[in-house]
Structure formats: C-alpha cells, structure tokens
Amino acid sequence: MSERTLPFALDVPCIAYHNLAFPLGIMKANINNFDEWLCNKLIDCKYENNYGRYNLFDSDIWDYAKGVTQTQSFHITPDLFNCNAFDIIGIIRYMIDHGNYIMGLLNEKYLPMKNAYGKYDFVHDFLIYGYDDNNRVFRSAGFGFLFSDE
C-alpha cells in the first residue's frame, strides 16, 4: 500500500470562492515568493475596472494562473461507471502519482463525514490532492475548507 500527497497550502487569502482558493492553495505551496506573486500578478489581472465597477471573476477560472499552472478537462459520463473495466480510484491515484490535482463536483449526500450525508443533496466542488491506501482515504479540500478523509 502507498501514500502520496501533493503540495497544497491551507492558508490562502481567499477561501470563500473555490475557483480562486483551489489554484491559490496549489500555487502557494509551489511558489517561493507567493506573496509577491499575489500582489504583482493576481490583483493586476483580476481586479479590472469594468463599466464603473470592479469585476473579480473571469470566464476562465485559471486565467490568472497562465504560465504558472496548466489544466486539462475531461468529463466522466454516468454510463462509464457501469463499464467493468472502469476504475475511478485507479484513475485518481494515477493522476496524483503523476503530479495532477483533481477538481470536480460531488454530491455530499453520499460522502460520510459531511453534514449532508444521507440527508439532502448538496452538490459542490472539490479538489483531491492526495491519497493514503493504508487508511483507504483521499486528501481533499471542499466546501468551507472542511478537510476530511473521504
């Protein structure tokens, strides 16, 4: 059994919006001069005066990280889970072993240790940045930065 955890910082300046918090957590853990980068790069790129107001969001959530991060997108359809050869755990482990962070959406109704577990639908974004086979858990960040081994 093995374990792997990619660098991820919890103490980022924005935790309310995951589209900012997740990449900032990755970059803070991987950039030596993160505070300088934040002041010189992020604020210049994201806080633009648009029609007399400041616009924080961009259509591409990773836009401000260009040159620092790279992203790939693929969608998993529900019918793929019915395929006998499909191993989602193996795919996640493979991606982490090759230095990739996984970001997506989960319904927390089906995640033990979450407030919504078994009670109500709560679809929210998440980031997986590690795994521990011995304890059969993934290291993840999610809503409100409640960290649990899911």
Where are these regions (language model features)?
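Active-site-adjacent substructure of cysteine-protease-like catalytic cores
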Residues: 12-15, 30-53, 85-137
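Noncatalytic regulatory segments and standalone regulatory/sensor domains
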Residues: 133-150
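Cysteine-nucleophile protease catalytic domains, especially the papain-like/related folds used
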Residues: 1-86
